[in-house]
Each structure stands twice: as structure tokens, then as C-alpha cells.
Swiss-Prot record:
Biological or metabolic pathway of the protein: Cell wall biogenesis; peptidoglycan biosynthesis
Function field: Cell wall formation. Catalyzes the transfer of a GlcNAc subunit on undecaprenyl-pyrophosphoryl-MurNAc-pentapeptide (lipid intermediate I) to form undecaprenyl-pyrophosphoryl-MurNAc-(pentapeptide)GlcNAc (lipid intermediate II).
Name used for this protein in its record: UDP-N-acetylglucosamine--N-acetylmuramyl-(pentapeptide) pyrophosphoryl-undecaprenol N-acetylglucosamine transferase
Gene name per UniProt: murG
Pfam families to which the protein is assigned, alphabetical: Glyco_tran_28_C, Glyco_transf_28
Reactions that this protein is recorded to catalyse: di-trans,octa-cis-undecaprenyl diphospho-N-acetyl-alpha-D-muramoyl-L-alanyl-D-glutamyl-meso-2,6-diaminopimeloyl-D-alanyl-D-alanine + UDP-N-acetyl-alpha-D-glucosamine = di-trans,octa-cis-undecaprenyl diphospho-[N-acetyl-alpha-D-glucosaminyl-(1->4)]-N-acetyl-alpha-D-muramoyl-L-alanyl-D-glutamyl-meso-2,6-diaminopimeloyl-D-alanyl-D-alanine + UDP + H(+)
Cited InterPro entries: GlcNAc_MurG, Glyco_trans_28_C, GlycoTrans_28_N
GO molecular function, one term: UDP-N-acetyl-D-glucosamine:N-acetylmuramoyl-L-alanyl-D-glutamyl-meso-2,6-diaminopimelyl-D-alanyl-D-alanine-diphosphoundecaprenol 4-beta-N-acetylglucosaminlytransferase activity
Length: 365
């Protein structure tokens, strides 16, 4: 290697598109790579949310025109190979022009052509799968990638190139104090249990409609913080209107500071997206997961099982959320000692150094 090659910063192209579940972990890794002196670029789709999220991040974006190929019409399926080929050549052109040294794919439609382009150019590829069930693109790329990162164990068949890293999470979440200390402090102060309900940015209609009636049946003192989405505030508030005196309820359209919300919660009730499960484990909070029933390959149930199987969480399928089932479940959980034990188990299965672990693997390629 020449002196000029040694002095040239490593150029890493990130590939992540479509959803925050792909983009946020990739962004955490990208920022850490930049801090270590790497040059970072991003392969994106023209209309994906990654363009908005990266607007102020000082990361140049290069777009290729690609869409999904699963479950679409006949004409689109027939055209798909040509679109993939065109997108692959576009990605190859960018990679050659930028002299990319390594490619890191975090999922989304863009990663398929991008990973293929890197392979054809002899550029090493790392992929990262956020869910417990591999997405279509990552499942295909795992065959050609040099390094395969999985957030949850056994997502991919065992191999020397498969590494369980966990999901990269924000620093604010990894900095949350230990669950034992938090729960014990609330217990000693005689505080009511804090129940946090999170439905995501749009809210989860099933949680908003079915949880209030069940929670109103409980007889212990509770502080309920229910994040329901901007469009469902009035309807959700109405369901709590006749709440008994033992309940204190706050209905919120969204939560600005999730780290604070996690740290103050004794129990969280939420969906089981990959990043949510990872943040719950990292924060150390007892959880009831209600997997999204329409999730591809039922991956949210698989995500939730990561914590449920070790006693850190309960799973309640949306189809079984009757008042009787919910009342029985919540009555069992209204015990801070039990919730403390669950929260401690959750923290024990967290991987707070996931971001640096993935960065180290990229640097070694």
C-alpha cells in the first residue's frame, strides 16, 4: 500500500431506505464513522424518508430509482429485473466515481442493487438486519456479504461471517440509569406504578381502543401515560373520561423525550418493532408487546420473543386482546417487584455497544 493510499480516509457508502427502522441504525453508524475520520456517503431512493432525515446530517446522498418486488402486479414483476439492472448500474457508477472502499447495507429496496453493485466491483459488503426474521433483501445479500450482522441471535444460519451485534441505539437510551435503581427508588417513595403506552408516531388504533377499558378495571393506583398519535387524541381521551379515582391519565399525541419516558416507566405497552424492542431492552423496562398483525413474516412476534423467552416481557397478540384477557394479564403485572425482575432481565439482554461493534466490523473490512 502506498503512502497516498494510507493517508486517504476510508470511504464507506451506507445503504438504507424506506423506514426509520432501517435508516436510524444506519445513521447512528454513519455518524460514528465520521467521528473516526471516515468519509461517508448514502445510497438512497428518490422518494424515501431517508432524504428528509439526512437533510441536516452533512452526508451526501446519491439516489437510484428502485421499488419493491414482493407482492406486486404482473407488469411490475416482469419489469423488475430490468429496473434492478438499471439501478445496479447506477450504483456501480456512483461507487466507482466516489472510490468507495466499503459498503454497509441496513435494508430497504436500495440495498439490493447497491449490494450487487459492490459485489460486482469487488467492494466488501457488510449487511445489518434489525429484525429477528431477515427481510427479503438482506436474506439475499447474506450470501455475498463479507460480514453479516444480526440484531437478534439465530436470525441467520450459523457461519463465521455472522455476528450478533444488536441494534444501534441513541446515546440518550444507553445512558439511562439501571432499572434496579430506578424501580427501587419509586418503590421506596411509595409512588404509583407508571404505565407507558406507545403507539408510534401515528398511534396504534387497537391499543387506543382496547387498553383504556381494561386499565379502568384495575383497582391499584396508576399513572398512565398514553401516546396515541395526533389524530386520535380526542377519541382516546373520551375512553378515559370516566376513569376511577385511582387512575391519573395523560393522553399525548407524541412524546418528545423517549429516554425520559422509558426511565420513568414501570411497564410499557407497545408494538414490537425491532428498534422498539431494542430500546426497551437497553433502557431496562418491563414490557407487554402487542405485535403488529400485518407485519411481513410476522417478524414483530419474533422480535418480541427475544425478551419474552427470558422472562423480560409478555406477548399479547392483537387478536386475543379481549377485556377478560387484558384484565387477567394486567392484574398479574401490577406488582413492582415482578416488574423490577422483568426490567433487570431486559437490561441483561441488551447490547448497548452495538453501534461501535458495527463500526469496528466496517473498519476491519
Amino acid at each position: 500500500m502506498t503512502d497516498s493510499q494510507q493517508s486517504k480516509p476510508k470511504h464507506v457508502m451506507m445503504m438504507a431506505a424506506g423506514t426509520g427502522g432501517h435508516v436510524f441504525p444506519a445513521l447512528a453508524v454513519a455518524k460514528q464513522l465520521q467521528q473516526q475520520g471516515c468519509q461517508v456517503s448514502w445510497l438512497a431512493t428518490p422518494t424515501g424518508m431517508e432524504n428528509r432525515l439526512l437533510k441536516d446530517q452533512n452526508i451526501p446522498i446519491y439516489q437510484i430509482d428502485i421499488q419493491g418486488v414482493r407482492g406486486n402486479g404482473v407488469i411490475r414483476k416482469l419489469a423488475a429485473p430490468f429496473k434492478i439492472l438499471k439501478a445496479t448500474f447506477s450504483a456501480m457508477r456512483y461507487m466507482k466515481q466516489l472510490k468507495v472502499d466499503a459498503v454497509a447495507g441496513f435494508g430497504g429496496y436500495v440495498a439490493g442493487p447497491g449490494g450487487l453493485a459492490a459485489r460486482l466491483l469487488g467492494i466488501p459488503v457488510l449487511i445489518h438486519e434489525q429484525n429477528a426474521v431477515a427481510g427479503f433483501t438482506n436474506a439475499q445479500l447474506s450470501r455475498v456479504a463479507k460480514v453479516v450482522c444480526e440484531a437478534f441471535p439465530n436470525t441467520f444460519p450459523a457461519s463465521e461471517k455472522v455476528v450478533t451485534t444488536g441494534n444501534p441505539v441513541r446515546r440518550e437510551i444507553t445512558d439511562i440509569l439501571s432499572p434496579k435503581w430506578r424501580y427501587d427508588e419509586r418503590e421506596q417513595a411509595g409512588k404509583p406504578l407508571n404505565i407507558l403506552i406507545v403507539g408510534g408516531s401515528l398511534g396504534a388504533k387497537a391499543l387506543n381502543e382496547r387498553l383504556p377499558p381494561a386499565l379502568k378495571q384495575l383497582e391499584v393506583p396508576l399513572n398512565i401515560f398514553h401516546q396515541c398519535g395526533q389524530q386520535q387524541v380526542e377519541a382516546t381521551q373520551a375512553l378515559y373520561a370516566d376513569a376511577p379515582a385511582n387512575l391519573t391519565v395523560q393522553v399525548l399525541p407524541f412524546i418528545e423525550d423517549m429516554a425520559k419516558a422509558y426511565s420513568e416507566a414501570d411497564l410499557i405497552i407497545c408494538r414490537a418493532g425491532a428498534l422498539t424492542v431494542t430500546e426497551v431492552a437497553t433502557a431496562g423496562v418491563a414490557a407487554v408487546f402487542v405485535p403488529l398483525p400485518i407485519a411481513v413474516d410476522d417478524h414483530q412476534t419474533a422480535n418480541a420473543k427475544f425478551l419474552a423467552d427470558v422472562g423480560a416481557a409478555k406477548i399479547c397478540q392483537q387478536s386475543t386482546m379481549t377485556p377478560e384477557v387484558l384484565n387477567q394479564l394486567f392484574t398479574t403485572l401490577m406488582n413492582r417487584q415482578l416488574l423490577t425482575e422483568m426490567a433487570v432481565k431486559a437490561r441483561q439482554h441488551a447490547q448497548p455497544n452495538a453501534t461501535q461493534h458495527v463500526v469496528d466490523l466496517i473498519q476491519k473490512m
